[in-house]
Amino acid sequence: MATHRKEPRWLSRLVVDSIHIEQLKEHGGLPGIRDENALEAALSRARNKWVYGQERDLPVLAAAYGFGLVTSHPYCDGNKRVGFLAIVTFLGINGRDFGATDSEVVTEILKLAGGQLSEGQLANWIRRHT
């Protein structure tokens, strides 16, 4: 397991909101934020793991973003898409590529949304594809 020693680049609220807006333009859906507190909590999960839990594994940190955004439903629509793209974007800005097939992505993100995939299992899946 490769660890990341220096502090990663984190996803800003602006970046995640922009991902949401772009996904709605491309695929449709209801605009807006359903739960502001859930969004802030989801965006804080990865950094909190780094600062307070001393977590250094990028797939674990990426999973924190995905898990938080998919399971807390902070937006009115598009949470699964935003959660997955947050994973990919976080990995990308920290020098890691993600390479799962579209069908694998759909299967795993739907399992996550349905409560059939834990955050740890998501991290393992991400690790296998980076």
Predicted regions and their residues:
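FIC/Doc superfamily catalytic core
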Residues: 1-130
